[in-house]
Design a protein with these regions (language model features):
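Conserved proline-anchored active-site loop of SAM-dependent methyltransferases
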Residues: 14, 29-43, 50-55, 101-104, ...
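Short amphipathic alpha-helix with an adjacent loop that forms part of the alpha/beta core around
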Residues: 19-21, 154-162
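Short, well-ordered coil/turn elements that cap or connect secondary structure elements
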Residues: 24, 43-45, 139-141, 159
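Intrinsically disordered, low-complexity segments enriched in small/polar residues
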Residues: 1, 27, 78, 106, ...
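S-adenosyl-L-methionine
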Residues: 1-29, 33-34, 38-43, 96
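Class I S-adenosyl-L-methionine-dependent methyltransferase module
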Residues: 46-148, 152-153
């Protein structure tokens, strides 16, 4: 998923380093600031936890995990503005989808995303591109436990012998 501060472009270098710390004794892998899940989705371990305090982000990631749940093909500027002004009237996952996928620069509700293709004439459908990125990531999110909250509130005994990656 496109996300401000994403480490996706660095994952080819970082994942092997992180993976090298995961041994047979490792009980799990934790990302306390999971963001767009662009690192955790590439780590190999049977017990992965992605934590974040952003309620709509975690709701979106959980929604996307369910392969039966459908996502819209795109998000219009009118829909973006309606959701931005009336967040309480929509489900959290949908607010997260609109806030991240239809926003310029993946900055949560930082302005509707617009852009042009390389010909500088044809408009791009950036929300549609972002939603397709999430669809591609979907299968890699299946075995991750997403939790909304401050990772400091996790019981220390729960995360003992975990590899923890903090961005």
């Amino acid at each position: 998923m496109k996300y401000v501060g994403s480490k996706n472009r660095l994952s080819k270098e970082l994942v092997p380093i992180i993976q090298s710390y995961i041994t047979k004794e490792t009980k799990g892998y934790l990302e306390p600031f999971v963001g767009g899940a662009n690192m955790i989705d590439k780590i190999k371990h049977h017990n992965k936890i992605g934590c974040d305090i952003h309620k709509q982000l975690i709701a979106l990631l959980k929604y996307v995990q369910n392969l039966d749940n459908e996502l819209p093909k795109t998000i219009s500027e009118e829909e973006y503005n309606n959701v931005k002004k009336n967040k309480d009237e929509y489900e959290d996952w949908y607010v997260g989808l609109v806030g991240f996928c239809a926003t310029f620069g993946a900055k949560y509700f930082g302005g509707y995303a617009r852009g042009f293709k390389e010909d500088k004439i044809t408009m791009r459908d950036i929300p549609s591109e972002s939603i397709r990125n999430i669809e591609k990531q979907r299968k890699n999110l299946q075995n991750i436990k997403f939790m909304c909250g401050n990772f400091l509130d996790l019981p220390k005994e729960l995360i003992k012998n975990y590899v923890i990656y903090q961005k």
